[in-house]
Amino acid sequence: MEKSQGYLELDKSWRHGFLYPLIFQEYIYALAHEQGLNRSILLENTDHDNKYSSLIVKRLITLIHQQNHFLIFDNDSNQNPFWKHNNNLYSQTISEGFVIIVEIPFSPRFVDSLEEKKKILKSNNLRSIHSIFPFLEDQILHLNFVANILIPYPIHLEIVVQSLRYRVKDASSLHLLRFFLFTLNKSISSFSKRNQRFFLFLYNSHVYEYESTFLFLRNKTSHLRSTSSGAFLERIFFYGKIKHLIEVFANDFQAILWLFKDPFMHYVRYQGKSILASKRTSLRMNKWKYYLVNFWQCQFYVWSQPGRVSINQLSNHSLDFLGYLSSVRRNPLAVRSQMLENSFLTDNAIKKFDIIVLLISLIGSLAKAKFCNVLGHPLSKPARADSSDSDIIERFVRICRNLSHYHSGSSKKKSLYRIKYILRLSCARTLARKHKTTVRSFLKRLGSELLEEFLTEDGQVISLIFPRTSSTSWRLYRGGIWYLDITCINDLANHE
C-alpha cells in the first residue's frame, strides 16, 4: 500500500511538473534501491545495503535542505579521504535518485498501479524487444540493402541538457542536473562507470530527440507535441522550422521529399546501434547516409563521420543485432513439373531469414562474468558461506533459463547446449569448492538431480501448448520460437 501511494505521489508531481521536491523524499531512494537489487541476474549487489542505508539518505537530504549541497561536490574536500568517499557516495545516490524520478512514469509497475486506479491507460510502448524479429522475418526478405549505423555521442554535456529540457520543464531540476554534470566534469570517466544508469538515461533522452525529428521527416506526419514541452520558446521555433522545411521540400525539392517518403524504408535501433534497411538501390542508400551525417551535425551539433554508417547488401551480409547474428540465405529447392508425357525439373531459390547465436561471443560474456575462461573451460564461482546448495543451484538454473528463453529464437540450438554444459559444470565446481571436495565425487553423490535441473526446463512451455507425443512440439523446439515477454536485453547477450 505504501509503495502504491509513493507511485501515486510521483504521478501527481510528474503531471504538475514539480520534480525537484521529490529529491527530498526518502522513498525515492528506496525505489532506486529495490530496482538496483532486481536489475542484474548475474552479479551480487553487496554494496546496496550500505549505499542506500536510511542514515546516509537522511544525511544527504539534510545537507540539501540546509542549502549546503555545494559542499557535497566541493573539490577541496577531496583532500580528506573520508569525505572523498562520502562525496562519491552522495553523488551516486543523487544521480540514481534523479534517474528514478524521471524514469518512474515509464516503468511497468508504475503503469500497472495507475491502471488499477484508472488514472492512465497502459502504454503501448511497453512491448517485448523480441517483437522486432517477427517483423524482420516478414519484411527483411523483400529488402535489398541495409545500413549499419553507429549513433554518435554528443560532443558536449550542455547538448544533453538542452535535449532533456524539452521533456522536463522543472527549471530547478535542470539547474541541479547542469550543476551536477559540470562539477563532476573532471572525473566524468570514472563517474560514468559507477553511474551507468544515469548516463544511459541522458543518452537515451538525446537519441529520443534525434529520432523524433528524423522519423517525423521520414513519415511527413504531424508531430505529436507533448504538453510538457509546449511552453518552451525553442520548441515553438522547432515546430516552425519543421513546417517551413516541409513547405520548402514540397515546393522546390521534390527529390529530397521523395527520399523521405520511401515506403520501403525500415528503421530499428537498440543501444548505440541502429539499422536502416531498404528495397531501393545502393545509390538511394548512399543518399540516406550523407543525409544522416549532415542531419546530426547541423541539427544537433553532433560531429559524425561517414565511416559510422556502413552500407551492405543483405544477401552478402549478416546483422549483429540484440545478441543474434541474422542473415538472409537462399535455400535451393527442386520442383518436378510434368506436362503431358514430358517432365522437367525447375531449380528455385527460396529466401529464408536465418538467426543464429554466436558461441564465441557468449563464451566471452561467460568468461567476463567468471563462469569460465576464454577457452570455455568452466570455473567455480565464490559462494557465500551462508548460501545453501539449493540457492546456488537455483541461481545457476535461473541464469540458464533466462539465456534459453532469450535465445530461443535461434535456428540452431547447438550453441545453447554448450552454454548449458558450461553453466552446469560451473555450478558443480562451485558446490564442490564449497564442500571442499572434488567435482567427480560431488556429482557421484548428487546423481542425476543436477542434470535434470538444467534440462527439464526447456520443453515445459512448449509441452503446455502441444502434447509431449506430438511431433509439432519437437519441431518447434528444434526451430525458432520467440518469447514475447522479453523487455530487456539479457546481461550475457549484451556483448559490448
Swiss-Prot record:
GO terms for molecular function: RNA binding. Its main location: plastid. InterPro entries: Domain_X (IPR024937), Maturase_MatK (IPR002866), Maturase_MatK_N (IPR024942). It comes from the Eukaryota. One of its GO terms (biological process) is tRNA processing. It is found in: Plastid, Chloroplast. Keywords: Chloroplast, mRNA processing, Plastid, RNA-binding, tRNA processing. It holds the Pfam family MatK_N. GO terms for cellular component: chloroplast. Disulfide bonds: none annotated. PANTHER family: MATURASE K (PTHR34811:SF1). Belongs to the intron maturase 2 family. MatK subfamily. Usually encoded in the trnK tRNA gene intron. Probably assists in splicing its own and other chloroplast group II introns. This is Maturase K. It comes from Paeonia lactiflora. The gene is matK.
